[in-house]
Amino acid sequence: MSARPGVVYLVGAGPGQMGLVTGRARELVATADTLIYDRLIPAALLEYAPAGCDVIDAGKRAGDHTLSQEEINALLVDAASQGRAVVRLKGGDPFVFGRGGEEGACLQQAGIPFEVVSGVTAGISVPASAGIPVTHRNVSNHVTLVTASAGPDGSGEPDYAWLAASEGTVVLFMGLRRVRRVADGLMSAGAPRTRPVAVISRGTTPRQRTVTGTLETIGDLVDAGQLVSPALIVVGDVVELRDQLNWFEQRPLFGHRIVVTRARAQASSLATHLRDLGADVVEAPTIRIEPINDDGLADHVRSCADTDMLIFTSRNGVDRWFGALHAT
């Protein structure tokens, strides 16, 4: 179903890997009049936007907001009021630390119809890509999703006493710069210093990096690893299962960046295969195949009955030759 005029779609774009974007999300992007996106979405998703679509970067980084939340809210209301089909793209799921609830409330108050399109949340998919199940029958029967980012006035600090007493898994969003503070807070609240911890950077993407340790050691390990955001912190005994279940980072081409220079029409299948093997693929076509008028080719094709062997130096030659053969 295409995006409808005058409606705002709050769309989750998944944790970063293009393959984890839902079909509904792609469909809405492809029919949007206005597209407002955050920085954590897969860049390739923007290529689905149609010609003439207003594409607006509303990306937020720590201490560097392209647009304030109030400005984003105003954009959504204004664009929809003009009868435009508006897609608001967010990393992960819009209702899991995505401020989708705030934007939905603003739209409701303004009388603007909206729909929520759920996405794959990073809180579950990113640990999975690091070989860490957030629940396990013999290890953890519950998971708690927490934001490690406090408000400007210092409010919103995690309830370390409650988390320290939990025997389940704790997943903390937006905490890379606060790893030491989180670890110290949990230990001060009584959590064992040996409690396993993982920090996963750029999860589900070919640039994923994972550091594991304990509450006591994780701060130094993260500093030494020079991890970058976005990153998740996973605390709990399930982290130890990574030794058995680390599948994503064990693929044969993981950690390798490969540039594919084939013509665009032919590059996608190769690029997909390389990505399935774990590679970070950059498609950079350096050639373009164009048909030429070659009246003599048909004569050559007809004369091949007396030929013992045909040698083709590229797929393009095969396509051109047999196209002429079928036409004769």
Regions found by a protein language model. Give the residues of each.
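Short gly/pro/ser/thr-enriched loop/turn and capping motifs at secondary-structure boundaries
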Residues: 43-44, 62-64, 121-125, 142-145, ...
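Class I S-adenosyl-L-methionine
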Residues: 1-18, 23-120, 125, 224, ...
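Short, solvent-exposed amphipathic alpha-helical segments in soluble enzyme
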Residues: 23-28, 49-53, 102-106, 131-132, ...
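Conserved anion/nucleotide-ligand pocket segment
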Residues: 150-198
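Phosphate-coordination loops involved in phosphoryl transfer and adenosine-cofactor binding
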Residues: 5, 83, 167, 254-256
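Signature of uroporphyrinogen-III synthase
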Residues: 2, 16, 205-328
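Acidic, glycine-enriched active-site microenvironments
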Residues: 105-106, 121, 125-128, 134, ...
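Class I SAM-dependent methyltransferase SAM-binding "motif I" and its flanking Rossmann-like core
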Residues: 17, 91-166, 211
